[in-house]
Amino acid sequence: MHLSPQEKDKLLIVTAALLAERRLKRGLRLNHPEAVAWLSFLVIEGARDGQSVAELMAEGSTWLRRDQVMDGVPELIPEVQIEAVFTDGTKLVTLHDPIR
């Protein structure tokens, strides 16, 4: 199987996000890379499901709470930017202050 660098990056995000999801279900708090991967994954999947950029940006601040991440993580992630494939092409989605 031959994957482009972008495809490899997306697979890495998905792998880290699945780990983050498992940890959330067990009640564990996410660290910085896990939180970024989880948020990125939700954007990518939301775009794939047909949500708009505006919908994802509005919902993005509801996906993780401060009590779901380790101390200091919200301050380390003032925004998350992820390119996602929408029905009308690839677009950049920015989540501002995604952990509240």
UniProtKB/Swiss-Prot annotation:
Root EC class: hydrolase
Entry's Gene Ontology BP terms: urea catabolic process
Homology family: Belongs to the urease gamma subunit family.
Descriptive protein name: Urease subunit gamma
InterPro entries assigned: Urease_gamma (IPR012010), Urease_gamma/gamma-beta_su (IPR002026), Urease_gamma_sf (IPR036463), Urease_subunit (IPR050069)
Gene Ontology, cellular component aspect: cytoplasm
Entry keyword set: Cytoplasm, Hydrolase
Key word Hydrolase present: yes
The enzyme's E.C. designation: 3.5.1.5
Gene Ontology terms for molecular function: nickel cation binding; urease activity
CDD domains found in the cross-reference section: Urease_gamma
Domain of life of the source: Bacteria
Compartments in which it is found: Cytoplasm
Cytoplasm listed as a keyword: yes
Quaternary context: Heterotrimer of UreA (gamma), UreB (beta) and UreC (alpha) subunits. Three heterotrimers associate to form the active enzyme.
Database matches in PANTHER family: UREASE
Annotated pathway: Nitrogen metabolism; urea degradation; CO(2) and NH(3) from urea (urease route): step 1/1
Pfam families on file: Urease_gamma
Reaction catalysis annotation: urea + 2 H2O + H(+) = hydrogencarbonate + 2 NH4(+)
